Amino acid sequence: TSHLPHLIAYNLVKTAVDFQKRNKKNIIKYSAGGLRDFSRTAASNEIMWRDIFFSNNDNVINSINIFIKNLNNFKKLIKYKKNKNILKILKNSKKVRKQIIDLKQDVSKPNFGRDIL
């Protein structure tokens, strides 16, 4: 799953470009910080990431399948306006984000300075 954020970033930027072309609107010019943040990840070396995706393709494909399942579930929750279910996912994601920040990753150390169980 560690490669999934890069794959999603590349695809989110592509989606913005495709949406912009289809709707003939300047989506990218007027996008907010979220797209900018994803585009930072998408600015990574494309040759390196191609090689990473290909060398670890089984795990990458498995992560994509799980992501698609979760994305389709999210789509259904939005379609049917499942307020409690959506809030549960959003709150849990916020909680996980806080846990990630609380780990105080140190990029200069192996495993980002975390104890790996």
Task: Please state what every model-predicted region is.
Residues 23-93:
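Interdomain hinge/lid region at the active-site interface
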Residues 89-95, 99-100, 112:
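N-terminus-biased detector of the onset of the functional/mature region
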